[in-house]
Regions:
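Surface-exposed, low-hydrophobicity segments enriched in Gly/Pro/acidic/Ser residues
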Residues: 1-209
Length: 209
């Protein structure tokens, strides 16, 4: 579930839903149409909470923070056109003073960051052959209507990158930005030494180009 507008800090989000698995229907929470007298106002309904009024990072694994989307990034535009769309991931290498499309050490030395993040697995004809370009696949790598890039991995610049680096402590401490996913925005913004990854490219959309 994703929302088009952010909830206020004191607002709560909860859902009830049903799904089918192996031909059997399962229900989570209660629906107002279930017909039970217990569900009629002013009685309470049982729902699955996705966001509490005190939603915040919790490194001990409690609460709902771990359910937050940690692989979707906004381009700041809508109605993105796939024609001549280009997107790259770069890393600001302070030792050479330039933006690079790869890291120059570890198991992924020289490997384009698009491939590291599984955003380049196909060629222009959708054959399974990386071609150095972003795979523009609606619903899998991009929501063109609302300008959202979808990384097909969780915590791309955190735990995923750490795994690609072989979980080498020296390399993960140098390159990984785990605080981007398990800290507040204010804390993450203060870690300028880790905030070195950028999405660059060009595109045409309703609000930007």
């Amino acid at each position: 579930i994703s929302l088009k507008s952010a909830l206020n800090q004191d607002e709560v989000l909860a859902v009830a839903y049903e799904y089918t698995y192996n031909g059997k229907v399962y229900q989570v929470g209660e629906f107002s149409t279930d017909g039970s007298e217990e569900l009629r106002a002013p009685n309470a309904m049982a729902l699955k909470m996705l966001k509490s009024s005190a939603n915040a990072p919790d490194k001990k694994g409690r609460g709902t923070w771990d359910l937050m989307m940690k692989n979707i990034y906004s381009l700041g535009a809508t109605s993105i056109n796939s024609d001549k769309f280009e997107l790259y991931i770069t890393y600001r290498n302070d030792s050479v003073g330039t933006e690079m499309q790869y890291l120059n050490e570890g198991p992924i030395n020289g490997k384009q960051l698009l491939r590291v993040m599984n955003l380049d697995r196909l060629d222009m004809k959708n054959n399974a052959s990386p071609d150095g370009r972003f795979d523009f696949v609606e619903g899998l790598t991009i929501y063109a209507s609302n300008g959202k890039i979808i990384f097909p991995v969780l915590e791309p610049f955190g735990s995923h990158l750490a795994a690609q680096l072989g979980n080498d402590t020296r390399l993960t401490n140098k390159y990984c930005f785990q605080e981007l996913y398990d800290s507040t925005l204010i804390v993450a913004q203060e870690l300028s030494e880790k905030n070195k990854f950028h999405l660059t490219g060009k595109y045409k959309g309703t609000n930007s180009s």
